[in-house]
Regions:
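Conserved ABC ATPase "signature" region
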Residues: 104-122, 174
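The feature captures the beta-strand-to-loop junction immediately N-terminal to the Walker
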Residues: 36-38
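Conserved ABC ATPase signature
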Residues: 126-130, 134
Length: 245
């Protein structure tokens, strides 16, 4: 099967500082891949390269065999900063990226995705009336409403409290089961990566290269406390320098 995302010898630096030091990775259609690495290793720069916000010094990122030169509606980014428009209602936020169809059809699509993420009844609410977890649901729904092939997530739950973040992970898995997206998640949370992903990619210190790729074979729902997953967690933490190997 051809790769949905193909990353070939990807390199990027700023002035004299090399940040991404040569990354090769293929992501299959419908696969969920998580990337973890030490703080400051170049994870966010890698995400910008994948999304087309930055161009590499050498190598390339390709989607369906086509090099990424600019941001694309087929690859939507959900970031830690949040991007909900405070002057728009939930429904209007979800309609924002919908270009096809008359207003009634776009509103129906927005309401469908609001219901999918558990926001039925809040379509007319403004962001200031919502909790942090509900705002993240709006972001996820808006990303999925434009029907992207690829969802790129840059530490999307890092600003949430631990209980809300755990709930949002479960919500994300539930929603992704309903639609077949290719997902690439960058996170500092090793348990989150193991809980969600089909594979976990561990990056080196800057300039980032791939140290190891860990396949996660256990089906969902998962418990990270399972011995097999705990063993993977310990191995990842050892590579990140948190535990002794």
């Amino acid at each position: 099967m051809d790769a949905k995302i193909a990353i070939k010898d990807l390199r990027k630096g700023f002035r004299s500082l090399p940040v991404v030091g040569g990354i090769d990775l293929d992501v299959a259609p419908g696969e969920f891949v998580a990337i973890v690495g030490p703080s400051g290793c170049g994870k966010s720069t890698l995400m910008k390269l994948l999304a087309g916000f930055e161009q590499p010094d050498s190598g390339h990122v390709a989607i369906d065999g086509v090099p990424v030169r600019r941001p694309s509606p087929n690859a939507i980014v959900i970031s830690q900063q949040g991007s909900v428009f405070p002057w728009l209602t939930v429904r209007e936020n979800l309609m924002f990226g919908l270009l096809d169809g008359d207003p009634a059809a776009r509103a129906a699509t927005a309401d469908h995705y609001a219901e999918m993420v558990g926001l039925k009844g809040f379509e007319k609410a403004y962001p200031q009336e919502l909790s942090g977890g509900m705002l993240k649901r709006v972001e996820i729904a808006r990303a999925l409403a434009v029907k992207p092939d690829i969802v790129l997530m840059d530490e999307p739950f890092s600003a949430l409290d631990a209980l809300t973040a755990l709930k949002m992970r479960n919500e994300l898995l539930r929603v992704l089961r309903e639609e077949n997206h290719t997902v690439l998640l960058i996170t500092h949370d090793v348990e989150e990566a193991i809980y969600l992903a089909d594979r976990v990619v561990v990056l080196s210190t800057r300039p980032a290269t791939i140290r190891t790729v860990f396949p996660i074979a256990q089906p969902h729902p998962r418990k990270v406390s399972q011995p097999a997953l705990q063993e993977i967690k310990d191995a990842i933490l050892a590579q990140l320098g948190v535990l002794e190997a």
